[in-house]
C-alpha cells in the first residue's frame, strides 16, 4: 500500500483479543500489543497509526507502555455510557461505539472531553445520514463511498 499510494496513508489497526482467548486464539494481551507495536515501528508508521480494541486490557497496556500511540476505545451497543471512561481509567483519543445507541447528547459530552467520536459500522444511507447529523468526527463503514456521497451532498 505504501509503495503505490500518492499520499501518506493512516492506519486503523484493531487488536482482537479477549480474556478467554489468551494463549489459545491469540497471544496474551500484553505480548499481542508488543508484537503489533514492534511491527508498526519496524515500518516507521507509528505517527499514522491508531490502535483500537474492545479489550480494555489492551488499551490500558498500550497507554502505559506506549503512550505515543493514538488509542481508540471500541464499545458495543450494550455498554453503559455513564461510567465508560471510569472503567477504562483514562480518556482515549477516540470513542468508537456501535452507532445504534449513539445520541447527540452522548456525542457532545464526549467531544467536550476533547475525545473524537467515530461510530462503527454504519452502512445504510439512512443510518449514515442520521449519524452525520449528530456531529460525529468520523464514521467507520463498509461503504465509504456512501459516506463521501452524503458528505458531498451537504456541501
Labelled PLM ranges:
Residues 2-155:
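Short loop-to-alpha-helix "cap/lid" segments that border enzyme active sites
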